[in-house]
């Protein structure tokens, strides 16, 4: 009779269970790690024990201060904490301050007067051993106490008006000066007089007042006009209303001044502006009965 063979299935089943347990623990650890990572992103902290809580609480406030601090504040704090930088900063502040005095209480005033320094508020600086900036400044020799701010101040020039000043920056208003302007040839002329009014810089009006100046046209150098005999204007031309050169009397041809000034008036009425009228000579004026009337001068009657 054959003997029954032993069953080998239980060892294989145990091996499979071992691999299954390892896989389950691996998956649980992976899931726990992912949960901690997600909670850490949301702001939670995953701890393995309670002993680390006080240490984390002590480290948390400095981190908040560093996050709230600005870069400039950190630089200033580092500069002030250094004693050498604090002394240099104190010297700079002492040189740049002006001569301002502040009223103090009676106790501070008496103590400062006994020391020989003016009344002031006592100042305290970080990182410096000096009790007061003004007290240490008063102990310096007088040559050192002179501020450098006075050297930078410049005297105001003539014609400048200071609008406002901030520190060493000033805004000034400069008044414009109107004087004599020179031509290219070097002769000074005043541009304040213009064409209005007909006045020249010599004080004359028109062509008859004052001496003509050098460089003026030739017509302004003519002598003043003399009174001429009573001569009425020649009859105007029918089509244009202007005097014809062929009808001009011969007596006027000898006077270049009278012939150079043509007379224009409506209808040919009234005497010429360059000749004296009858009213100027004291004779009563007669009514003009004809619009076209020509009177020759006294010497031209015999011609």
From Swiss-Prot:
Membrane topology: Single-pass membrane protein
Record PTM Phosphoserine, positions in chain: 52
Tissue: Primarily expressed in spleen, thymus, testis, peripheral blood leukocytes, brain and placenta. Not detected in prostate, ovary, small intestine, colon, heart, lung, liver, skeletal muscle, kidney and pancreas.
Keyword vocabulary terms for this entry: Cell membrane, Membrane, Phosphoprotein, Transmembrane, Transmembrane helix
Modification comment: Phosphorylated in vitro by OXSR1.
Region (Disordered): 46-67, 132-303
One GO CC term, this protein: plasma membrane
Regions crossing the membrane: 15-35
InterPro entries assigned to the protein according to its UniProt record, in alphabetical order: RELL2 (IPR042313), TNF_rcpt_RELT (IPR022248)
Entry's Gene Ontology molecular function annotations: collagen binding
Homology family: Belongs to the RELT family.
Subunit relationships: Interacts with RELT, RELL1 and OXSR1. Interacts with PLSCR1. Interacts with TRAF2.
Function: Induces activation of MAPK14/p38 cascade, when overexpressed. Induces apoptosis, when overexpressed.
Protein name: RELT-like protein 2
Organism encoding this protein: Homo sapiens
Name of the gene encoding the protein in the UniProt record: RELL2
């Amino acid at each position: 009779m054959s003997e029954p063979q032993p069953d080998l299935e239980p060892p294989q089943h145990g091996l499979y269970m071992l691999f299954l347990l390892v896989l389950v623990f691996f998956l649980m650890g992976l899931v726990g790690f992912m949960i901690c990572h997600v909670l850490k992103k949301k702001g939670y902290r995953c701890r393995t024990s309670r002993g680390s809580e006080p240490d984390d609480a002590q480290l948390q406030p400095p981190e908040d201060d560093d996050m709230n601090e600005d870069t400039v504040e950190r630089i200033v704090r580092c500069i002030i904490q250094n004693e050498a930088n604090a002394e240099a900063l104190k010297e700079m502040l002492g040189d740049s301050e002006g001569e301002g005095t502040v009223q103090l209480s009676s106790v501070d005033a008496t103590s400062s007067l006994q020391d020989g320094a003016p009344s002031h508020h006592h100042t305290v600086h970080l990182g410096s051993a000096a009790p007061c900036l003004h007290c240490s400044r008063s102990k310096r020799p007088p040559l050192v106490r002179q501020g450098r701010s006075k050297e930078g101040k410049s005297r105001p020039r003539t014609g400048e008006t200071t609008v406002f000043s901030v520190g060493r920056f000033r805004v000034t208003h400069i008044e414009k000066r109107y004087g004599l302007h020179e031509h290219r040839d070097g002769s000074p002329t005043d541009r304040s007089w213009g064409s209005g009014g007909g006045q020249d810089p010599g004080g004359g009006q028109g062509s008859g007042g004052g001496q003509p100046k050098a460089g003026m046209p030739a017509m302004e150098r003519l002598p003043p006009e003399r009174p001429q005999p009573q001569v009425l204007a020649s009859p105007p031309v029918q089509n244009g209303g202007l005097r014809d050169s062929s009808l001009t009397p011969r007596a006027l041809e000898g006077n270049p001044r009278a012939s150079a000034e043509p007379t224009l008036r409506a209808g040919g009425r009234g005497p010429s502006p360059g000749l004296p009228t009858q009213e100027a000579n004291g004779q009563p004026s007669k009514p003009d009965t004809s619009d076209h009337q020509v009177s020759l001068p006294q010497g031209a009657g015999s011609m």
